UniProtKB/Swiss-Prot annotation:
Gene name, Swiss-Prot/TrEMBL: Zkscan1
InterPro entries referenced in this protein's UniProt entry, alphabetically: KRAB, KRAB_dom_sf, SCAN_dom, SCAN_sf, Znf_C2H2_sf, Znf_C2H2_type
Keywords for this protein: DNA-binding, Isopeptide bond, Metal-binding, Nucleus, Phosphoprotein, Repeat, Transcription, Transcription regulation, Ubl conjugation, Zinc, Zinc-finger
Protein species of origin: Mus musculus (Mouse)
Composition bias type Basic and acidic residues, residue spans: 276-286, 294-349
Name by which UniProt lists this protein: Zinc finger protein with KRAB and SCAN domains 1
Pfam (any one): SCAN
Domain KRAB positions: 225-304
Spans annotated as Disordered: 1-51, 163-187, 260-372
Transmembrane segments: none
Compartment(s): Nucleus
The keyword Transcription regulation belongs to this UniProt entry's keyword annotation: yes
GO BP terms in the entry: regulation of DNA-templated transcription
Length: 561
């Protein structure tokens, strides 16, 4: 008993052994346990099962060049994935947990990945708990020094007064004590904290552990900077909107020239604008480099959005100018003396105009994040990245066709469709085949034509395996298996699986015979029947030669030999 107790005690630091005077409850470290286990007789030890991490790395690092073909590569990948995930042992939830854990570890900083690999977490919750414990102890250890100025603002760190300092150290001691006696690894704190943050009695961590801890602290400080930067940008953006709205209101008031009432309001707005500019300048100075960086970053964007708002306000300004030039009796508003205040109606007008400017400013397409589909169609629910695309899409539901062909009068909903249609009249065929030189008016027709040369048949029937170069041919073929006959004759009710068959059938009722023989003038409903008819005339030409003439011609050939 004493031997085992002394062996366990050797795995502890001197400080941990002197913490209690009574019974010392310790947990042997992973390295000591492994040394003790392998120190026994090797003949008594069973071969440990393969590590799943080994199979995972084999699965992820598998290369196609190591195989002799795609089928062998796929089978090898299935085998490696089976060895890693072990579906015969693990449930679906466990397999899902393994995949999520792998992805979670891959997005962590390198230092944290190396640190977590030592503990081999079995689930994502266990990995998160380890990181949260580490972060809690690091936050308890961090006591900022006496640093002032822009660097403190950028990091979001505020100097601690003596009361806060003492409470911070108390919190650190409590967290450290809890961490030592938890079920986690005993050297977690000493490994996690860099030497500058670990108290003096503890030994210093190695450089790799210090880098890992600094990564955690850097992530925290970056999060603080991002939050503060976002607040600064929102403040500047809001003030930019207000200043732009005020400038537009001042311009409108000068154009309308409605008397001293608007002049007084313009002076008030100019005063407010100068006050806002002073506030922005003061706030930018206090934020230092952060505000300057955001002003530079969003300068061009604000300028572009300002031009958009001016274009949106162009038509209302022209309308206002026309109304101003129309003659008429003087209104009560013009006769009203200047009192230095606006009436309720004029205040409402000013607020309404300012609100519409803000709404237009906030709804500009440039405000939306890149790739975000914020414009949604109310009819079908389809979303678009730009409002112009949504407007073009809505034409489909309304049935509007504003683009009309000047040649035939046919109308289209999109201008691009009109351009393609006009090539029928002009005969333009800009898409030419490199193999045979044949030209097409549509690029899609060229793609279908090129499959004739390449022999590509990407559309395959699931029933019989027959392949086709066009999807329409596959659709027609599949009707043979399904028995679908969507084309029905309105005269007799007979149905067909192809439209061409229905057209041929209708000629029976209409007695139309478009295919006419040039020799005898006989007409037929089908081109195939005309081809068979041509053979009759061909046999007639061969029968013009009598048998006697043929025998004489044969004798002549023999004499030549």
């Amino acid at each position: 008993m004493m031997t085992a107790e002394s062996r366990e005690t050797t795995g502890l630091s001197p400080q941990a052994a002197q913490e209690k005077d009574g019974i010392v409850i310790v947990k042997v470290e992973e390295e000591d346990e492994e040394d003790h286990m392998w120190g026994q007789d090797s003949s008594l030890q069973e071969t440990p099962p393969p590590d799943p991490e080994v199979f995972r790395q084999r699965f992820r690092r598998f290369c196609y060049q190591n195989t002799f073909g795609p089928r062998e590569a796929l089978n090898r990948l299935k085998e490696l994935c089976h060895q890693w995930l072990r579906p015969e042992v693990n449930s679906k939830e466990q397999i899902l947990e393994l995949l999520v854990l792998e992805q979670f570890l891959s997005i962590l900083p390198k230092e944290l990945q190396v640190w977590l690999q030592e503990y081999r977490p079995d689930s994502g919750e266990e990995a998160v708990t380890l990181l949260e414990d580490l972060e809690l102890d690091l936050s308890g250890q961090q006591v900022p020094g006496q640093v002032h100025g822009p660097e403190m603002l950028a990091r979001g760190v505020v100097p601690l007064d003596p009361v806060q300092e003492s409470s911070s150290f108390d919190h650190h001691e409590t967290a450290q004590s809890h961490f030592k006696h938890s079920s986690r690894k005993p050297r977690l704190l000493s490994r996690a904290l860099p030497a500058t943050h670990v108290p003096a009695p503890h030994h210093e961590g190695n450089p790799r552990d210090q880098a890992m801890a600094s990564a955690l602290l850097t992530a925290d400080s970056q999060a603080m900077v991002k939050i503060e930067d976002m607040a600064v940008s929102l403040i500047l953006e809001e003030w930019g909107c207000q200043n732009l709205a005020r400038r537009n209101l001042n311009r409108d008031s000068r154009q309308m020239n409605l008397g001293n009432v608007f002049s007084q309001g313009s002076e008030n707005r100019n005063g407010n604008e100068s006050t806002s500019k002073a506030e922005v300048k003061e706030d930018s100075t206090s934020h230092g480099e952060i505000a300057g960086r955001f002003q530079k970053e969003f300068g061009e964007k604000r300028e572009q959005q300002g031009r958009v708002v001016e274009r949106q306000q162009k038509n209302p300004e022209e309308k206002t100018g026309k109304e101003k030039k129309e003659p008429g009796p003087p209104t009560a508003k013009e006769k009203k003396p200047s009192t230095g205040e606006r009436g309720p109606r004029e205040k409402g007008k000013g607020l309404g105009r300012s609100f519409s400017l803000s709404a237009n400013f906030n709804n500009t397409p440039e405000e939306a994040p890149s790739g975000a589909k914020t414009h949604r169609c109310d009819e079908c629910g389809k979303c678009f990245t730009r409002s112009s695309s949504l407007i073009r899409h809505k034409i489909i539901h309304t049935g509007e066709k504003p683009y009309e062909c000047n040649e035939c009068g046919k109308a289209f909903s999109l201008n691009s469709n009109l351009v393609l249609h006009q090539r029928i009249h002009t005969g333009e065929k800009p898409h030419e085949c490199n193999e045979c030189g044949k030209a097409f008016s549509h690029s899609s027709n060229l793609i279908l034509h090129q499959r004739i040369h390449s022999g590509e048949k990407p559309y395959e029937c699931n029933e019989c395996g027959k392949a086709f170069s066009q999807s329409s041919d596959l659709t027609k073929h599949q009707r043979i298996h399904t028995g679908e006959k969507p084309y029905e004759c309105s005269e007799c009710g007979k149905a067909f699986n192809r439209n061409s068959y229905l057209i041929l059938h209708r000629r029976i009722h209409t007695r139309e015979k478009p295919y006419k023989c040039t020799k005898c003038g006989k007409a037929f409903t089908r081109s195939s029947t005309l081809t068979l008819h041509h053979r009759i005339h061909a046999r007639e030409r061969t029968s013009e030669y009598s048998p006697a003439s043929l025998d004489a011609f044969g004798a002549f050939l023999k004499s030549c030999v």
